[in-house]
Amino acid sequence: MAAVAVAVREDSGSGMKAELPPGPGAVGREMTKEEKLQLRKEKKQQKKKRKEEKGAEPETGSAVSAAQCQVGPTRELPESGIQLGTPREKVPAGRSKAELRAERRAKQEAERALKQARKGEQGGPPPKASPSTAGETPSGVKRLPEYPQVDDLLLRRLVKKPERQQVPTRKDYGSKVSLFSHLPQYSRQNSLTQFMSIPSSVIHPAMVRLGLQYSQGLVSGSNARCIALLRALQQVIQDYTTPPNEELSRDLVNKLKPYMSFLTQCRPLSASMHNAIKFLNKEITSVGSSKREEEAKSELRAAIDRYVQEKIVLAAQAISRFAYQKISNGDVILVYGCSSLVSRILQEAWTEGRRFRVVVVDSRPWLEGRHTLRSLVHAGVPASYLLIPAASYVLPEVSKVLLGAHALLANGSVMSRVGTAQLALVARAHNVPVLVCCETYKFCERVQTDAFVSNELDDPDDLQCKRGEHVALANWQNHASLRLLNLVYDVTPPELVDLVITELGMIPCSSVPVVLRVKSSDQ
């Protein structure tokens, strides 16, 4: 039986196998010597050719990089990773990643320059700066824009919302500091109700009266503003009548929305007022459709009374008892501005027999500390009065700082009357503990690290100081380079606050998220 002979030879350099297929007459015989020599010669030529190609590829790659950097306006660049003159041949493995990145970057810059040159030839607009260099200084440091970027669409929506609700809009003052140009600023001289017809208006008269009191500063303070709002809402609920084919739980909520927009036009709502409105809306939506109207209205008014009693009155009593433990005989306590809660704590501690002295620090333009000074002197508490620039001179003899709060944010920051952060910082420099007294209904889920993003701007005309017939800063609007900033609140970081006294107990600022989580689970 004849066997088929196949010659197989392995090349140690290439690792490939060569196989000579049998010819027409090669079946049953071995390869001749001449055939083996011819096969060995062909293999050597192929191996030499591969070595020459490997040595020529790096030179070709460097030529590609040089050609890409000097590309003209009419030359098309080859794709990255493809060698010139070869169909879809990959970049050799000898190239480093840095060289490949530099090559791609040079290609992109060349293509960008080519596009800009074509636009210039067509008479188009001048080319814009590339995203990589826009807003950068020659040193490579990015700079923030000079003016804050405000979304025009959002502003139009905010303006149209009161118009849809038939709420009069208040004219903005216009002359503002550029850093706070995104915040509304109103003048008390521009009346919101000047062209408002009360009989034909959708705004309840109680809300109109409350809004005017807010705008003129007749009702100030977080607790006083919140209580006044809830009392006005009780009057609104008392006068409310459910329309035909409507449910109280739905119609009343919609009826309150223009009222809140009107109050916001008068003065931005505080965090405590937002929480009270959220509570009332929840109570309204939980009213069953089977209840009679008078019964439902009576329950809502009772819920408002219960909210005021539990969240404000009883909470103040509990905070006063906790704060009493932190006041010792012979203390020198520094307070700032006018906080109804802090004033109550000091008066009750004096009535209980603790003997101490109070330093009242005040600041323009409100000078609210005078109200605190009158109440303390009337109660027999020894007190002294000074302005905030002189606070650093009395802090060496102060034993503790007792402050109120407008709101306590979710990140532990304290939002309070402007100047509070300054006092807390100076107190930390003198190693004086800072205690903040705040009810938990002022806790909010908003997070804020500075006073620039969200704040309130008061009337800048209040900064004018009148001494006799002379008025400082008179006609300041006529000076184009002059702007007045009357900031209402500032934000104190939690690192400057040693303790927060609430009706739940004495907690650190880091426990604010825990309190918010417990409150949300209870609701």
Swiss-Prot record:
InterPro entries the UniProt entry points to: IF-2B-related (IPR000649), IF_2B-like_C (IPR042529), NagB/RpiA_transferase-like (IPR037171)
Annotated positions of the Phosphoserine modification: S12, S130
Basic and acidic residues: bias regions: 30-40, 87-121
Q: Any idea which UniProt keywords this protein has?
A: Acetylation, Cytoplasm, Disease variant, Initiation factor, Leukodystrophy, Phosphoprotein, Protein biosynthesis
Q: Does the keyword Protein biosynthesis apply?
A: yes
Name where it's found.
Cytoplasm, Cytosol
> In the UniProt annotation, what is the result of changing C465R?
In VWM4; with ovarian failure
Q: Where is this region: Disordered?
A: 1-147
Q: Which GO terms describe its cellular component?
A: cytoplasm; cytosol; eukaryotic translation initiation factor 2B complex
Q: Which SUPFAM superfamilies match?
A: NagB/RpiA/CoA transferase-like
Main location, first listed in the record? cytoplasm
What regulates the activity here? Activated by the chemical integrated stress response (ISR) inhibitor ISRIB which stimulates guanine nucleotide exchange factor activity for both phosphorylated and unphosphorylated eIF2.
Sample GO molecular function, one term: translation initiation factor binding
Residues of the region (May bind the chemical integrated stress response (ISR) inhibitor ISRIB) are 170-179
Which BP terms does GO give this entry? cytoplasmic translational initiation; myelination; oligodendrocyte development; ovarian follicle development; regulation of translation; response to glucose; response to heat; response to peptide hormone
Phosphothreonine modification, residue list? T86
Basic residues bias (residue ranges):
41-51
Positions carrying N-acetylalanine are A2
Q: Its quaternary structure?
A: Component of the translation initiation factor 2B (eIF2B) complex which is a heterodecamer of two sets of five different subunits: alpha, beta, gamma, delta and epsilon. Subunits alpha, beta and delta comprise a regulatory subcomplex and subunits epsilon and gamma comprise a catalytic subcomplex. Within the complex, the hexameric regulatory complex resides at the center, with the two heterodimeric catalytic subcomplexes bound on opposite sides.
Q: Which family does it belong to?
A: Belongs to the eIF-2B alpha/beta/delta subunits family.
Which disease is noted in the annotation?
Leukoencephalopathy with vanishing white matter 4: An autosomal recessive brain disease characterized by neurological features including progressive cerebellar ataxia, spasticity, and cognitive deficits. Brain imaging shows abnormal white matter that vanishes over time and is replaced by cerebrospinal fluid. Disease severity ranges from fatal infantile forms to adult forms without neurological deterioration. The disease is progressive with, in most individuals, additional episodes of rapid deterioration following febrile infections or minor head trauma.
- What job does the chain carry out? Acts as a component of the translation initiation factor 2B (eIF2B) complex, which catalyzes the exchange of GDP for GTP on eukaryotic initiation factor 2 (eIF2) gamma subunit. Its guanine nucleotide exchange factor activity is repressed when bound to eIF2 complex phosphorylated on the alpha subunit, thereby limiting the amount of methionyl-initiator methionine tRNA available to the ribosome and consequently global translation is repressed.
Q: Mind telling me what this protein is named?
A: Translation initiation factor eIF2B subunit delta
Q: Which organism is it from?
A: Homo sapiens
